[in-house]
């Protein structure tokens, strides 16, 4: 969707929360909801909700509100959840194994195709019937298989090296858990998850309370 290029990142960051809450409403058989009611559940202002959704089209009707199932379907389209994304994990340590074992991602359309690691003790072990491969063969695997997203779960000193291999072999999406800011071409999208950043944010908030 070309229009996304003009949408602020702050709006895009809020979309998964809309998706999650709308899914919960559907499971609870809620057919329609006003922006005010959604505001009370999701924690955004009603005005913010209307502005966010208007970025992608006219979804609500005055006096009626939003049709929950239709809005959920549109949110899936906006988030790209109508396709299947082929993924690989590089780094089978604690974080890599936790992601590998989480089946919720597959329900959203993110299929795990392969896992790679440098540790001889891990190579050959299977996680959910996917055998951990030697990272030396990552490039060969990517040349032989189309992969959409690479999930980097390696130490910071290897993060950029792994990223370079992914980019060189056509991977356009990187979910980065390595504590390093990656350098990538403009056509490659990176989502960083620096766990310590989140924890330090919490510690700052706690410190402010005290």
UniProtKB/Swiss-Prot annotation:
What does the UniProt keyword field contain? Cytoplasm, DNA-binding, NAD, Repressor, Transcription, Transcription regulation
Q: What is its main location?
A: cytoplasm
Q: Quick one: a GO biological-process term for this protein?
A: response to redox state
Q: Does Nucleotidyltransferase appear among the keywords?
A: no
Report the GO terms under cellular component: cytoplasm
Residue ranges of DNA binding:
17-56
S-S bridge residues: none
Q: What GO molecular function terms would the record report?
A: DNA binding; DNA-binding transcription factor activity
Q: Which family is annotated?
A: Belongs to the transcriptional regulatory Rex family.
* Entry function: Modulates transcription in response to changes in cellular NADH/NAD(+) redox state.
**What protein name does the entry list?**
Redox-sensing transcriptional repressor Rex
Native source organism of the sequence: Clostridium kluyveri (strain ATCC 8527 / DSM 555 / NBRC 12016 / NCIMB 10680 / K1)
